[in-house]
């Protein structure tokens, strides 16, 4: 079936919540843009921990997480990944099959424990009592909300431990740091600046805190956040987004930045590979860009085993042995959140052949919020039982007779093949033309007076390229010149206002602000003059600094064009620019008279002495003062008598013709 008619799923046996999913809204043209990503790591470095505190943090199981610096988030990339996340399976549905963030990923990337007691306990409706007990002080009413406390209150009151602090005070300040750490990273909420105090009792004994499966809890929290954000009505996402982004960097060749340095492959945890400044054009990439990339992703864009050459020398033996839990079909628990971990749907991430996975059992997600005031252990008995059986539910090794072609045929029937509706080539072309018009308008309105010569010429080059792109477009409205460009590049000629169009057409009574359209001539390089037996197109360029019009002869044979010859000029004469391919009848008569005078050996009616710099300078100064020159016929005649010249002006000097009010001069 045509993917445009039905992008999937063709059968709703797996993705039964398609109508609620953001991909349905995107297909219908309802763009929500990039998600607001809530992760609060920017001020973690302001905590000044003493050696005793660092020791307690490591005993609690957060020694590696503490070392991870703030990593700039790519919100559009994260948003595009969310569009591929399905909460029915807790996996990404890509073109190559399903993938997910596993327990193995979180252990290797963050260095958090994935085996141990589930992170669950009491929830609280107020902060005062629990903060007083574990921190030694309680927040004011403006620093707390229900069972949550502001991160800023924790930092302001506990970020620096006095040198002479008692051991009890050191423990209290360390608990405050741990609460801030988890609330800023693995358990960040959409509130943006608060963390639940229900984690504090788990830090009462630091050695006991190290026996919890914090990595499994962090993954449950992220799964829930991804599922919530995939609903089309949502606009925010929380959880450990550094984990999600770095997982994508390792597994997908989409949005991956280039490192400014050679990575340290064995630095553990592996998320440290992406710390520091990075290169790459990600700044200008939006959700649509990443969505298109994911829609056409190929198998070669996927790295199924990104850690196989990384040994993680600092990893403990306990953690190394627990990596097998990455293949465990189990339930992940984080207080009020329980999420299924289904690695059997992503066997290729463990170097196994992918067969058709078992049906996903539908389950009702339990969530009582953080203000329930109850012990959740009594509310999640079945989920806790599954976690207890985690080592008995390891996905087996390869079985005989697995055909991945059968899997892909099945998968394409149950998945959402693409998220973005394909755009026709004509629509893409029109969008490009519209963008070029915008670029041209911006360039023409750019304030170039304060720029140096190089940058000014660069702006001129941009204008020329944009005009060249728009030249042959039907219905393209010519872009008006700005007053700034008129002052720099155009001059009035007598009582005549001139507009160049095509190959230099002259028309009277044209406003100097009138549009400059593209050339009607097929030549791409401007007027043609004969040199010997070859006709060289002259490339027309405006100088934005002195108002001259420069013509550069194209010298490459491949760029030359054939044309009808113009009258043969004497070889002893230099070639001046020919301006105006289409003349009014009166103008044509004047031009023919000038040509005839020249061929008869007479001095041209109008000529200039290139050595009379003082006279030119005076005229230029007058022009600059007026903005446009008004030169009467009598003044022209006086100049003709004064200027006895030999022909042979250079191309750059021909620009003075414009400033003196001349029409067309042929030497």
Swiss-Prot record:
Pfam families according to UniProt: PMD (PF10536)
GO CC terms of this entry: nucleus
Residues that bear N-acetylmethionine: 1
Tissue spec. comment: Expressed in root tips, the shoot apical meristem (SAM), leaves, mature flowers and embryos.
Bias (Basic residues) ranges: 492-508
Gene Ontology BP annotations: meristem maintenance
Keywords, alphabetical: Acetylation, Aminotransferase, Nucleus, Transferase
Keyword Manganese set for record: no
GO molecular function, one term: transaminase activity
Comp. bias regions, Basic and acidic residues: 608-618, 656-667
Region spans: Disordered: 492-523, 594-667
Biased segments, Acidic residues type: 512-523
Subcellular location: Nucleus
PANTHER family reported for this sequence: PROTEIN MAIN-LIKE 2 (PTHR46033:SF1)
Its job: Maybe required to maintain cell division activity in meristematic cells.
Name of the protein described by the UniProt record: Protein MAIN-LIKE 2
Native organism: Arabidopsis thaliana
């Amino acid at each position: 079936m045509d993917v445009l008619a039905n992008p999937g799923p063709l059968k709703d046996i797996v993705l039964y919540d398609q109508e609620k999913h953001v991909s349905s809204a995107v297909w219908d043209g309802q763009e929500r843009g990039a998600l607001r990503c809530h992760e609060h790591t920017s001020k973690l470095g302001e905590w000044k921990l003493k050696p005793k505190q660092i020791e307690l943090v490591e005993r609690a199981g957060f020694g590696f997480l503490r070392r991870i610096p703030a990593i700039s988030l790519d919100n559009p990339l994260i948003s595009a990944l969310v569009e591929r996340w399905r909460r029915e399976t807790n996996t990404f549905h890509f073109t190559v099959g399903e993938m997910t963030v596993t327990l193995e990923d979180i252990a290797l990337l963050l260095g958090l424990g994935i085996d141990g007691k589930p992170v669950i306990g009491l929830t609280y409706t107020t902060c005062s009592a629990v903060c007083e007990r574990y921190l030694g002080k309680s927040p004011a009413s403006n620093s707390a909300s229900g069972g949550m406390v502001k991160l800023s209150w924790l930092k302001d009151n506990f970020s620096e431990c006095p040198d002479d602090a008692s051991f009890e005070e050191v423990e209290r300040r360390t608990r405050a740091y741990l609460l801030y750490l988890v609330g800023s990273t693995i358990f960040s909420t959409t509130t943006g600046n608060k963390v639940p105090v229900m984690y504090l009792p788990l830090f009462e004994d630091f050695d006991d805190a190290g026996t919890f499966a914090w990595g499994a809890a962090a993954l449950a929290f992220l799964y829930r956040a991804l599922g919530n954000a995939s609903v089309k009505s949502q606009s925010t996402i929380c959880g450990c987004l550094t984990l999600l982004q770095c997982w994508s960097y390792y597994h997908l060749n989409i949005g991956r930045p280039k490192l400014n340095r050679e990575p340290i492959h064995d630095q553990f945890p592996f998320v440290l590979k992406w710390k520091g400044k990075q290169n790459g054009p990600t700044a200008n990439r939006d959700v649509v860009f990443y969505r298109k990339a994911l829609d056409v992703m190929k198998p070669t864009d996927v790295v199924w085993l990104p850690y196989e050459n990384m040994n993680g020398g600092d990893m403990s033996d306990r953690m190394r042995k627990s990596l097998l839990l990455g293949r465990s079909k189990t339930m992940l628990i984080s207080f009020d959140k329980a999420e299924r971990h289904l690695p059997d749907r992503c066997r290729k991430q463990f170097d196994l052949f992918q067969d058709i996975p078992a049906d996903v059992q539908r389950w009702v997600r339990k969530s009582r919020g953080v203000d329930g005031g109850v012990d959740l252990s009594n509310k999640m008995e079945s989920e806790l039982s599954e976690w207890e059986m985690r080592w008995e539910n390891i996905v087996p090794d390869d079985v005989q007779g697995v055909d991945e072609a059968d899997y892909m045929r099945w998968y394409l029937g149950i998945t959402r093949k693409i998220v973005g509706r394909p755009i026709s080539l004509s629509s893409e072309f029109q969008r490009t033309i519209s963008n070029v018009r915008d670029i041209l308008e911006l360039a023409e309105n750019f304030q170039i007076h304060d720029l140096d010569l190089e940058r000014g010429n660069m702006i001129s080059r941009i204008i020329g390229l944009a005009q060249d792109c728009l030249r042959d477009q039907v219905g393209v409205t010519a872009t008006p010149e700005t007053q700034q460009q008129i002052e720099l590049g155009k001059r009035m000629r007598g009582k005549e206002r001139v507009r160049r169009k095509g190959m230099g057409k002259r028309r009277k009574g044209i406003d100097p602000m009138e549009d400059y359209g593209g050339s009607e001539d097929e030549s791409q390089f401007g007027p043609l003059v004969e040199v010997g037996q070859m006709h060289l197109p002259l490339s027309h360029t405006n100088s934005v600094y002195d108002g001259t019009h420069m013509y550069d002869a194209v010298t490459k044979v491949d760029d030359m064009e054939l044309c009808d010859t113009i009258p043969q000029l004497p070889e002893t004469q230099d070639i001046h620019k020919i301006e105006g391919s289409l003349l009014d009848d009166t103008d044509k008569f004047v031009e023919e008279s000038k040509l005839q005078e020249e061929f008869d050996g007479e001095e041209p009616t109008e000529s200039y002495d290139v050595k009379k710099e003082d006279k030119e300078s005076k005229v230029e100064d007058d022009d600059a003062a007026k903005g446009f020159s008004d030169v009467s016929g009598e003044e022209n005649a006086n100049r003709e008598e004064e200027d006895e010249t030999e022909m042979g002006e250079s191309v750059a000097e021909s620009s003075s013709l414009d400033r003196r009010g001349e029409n067309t001069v042929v030497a």
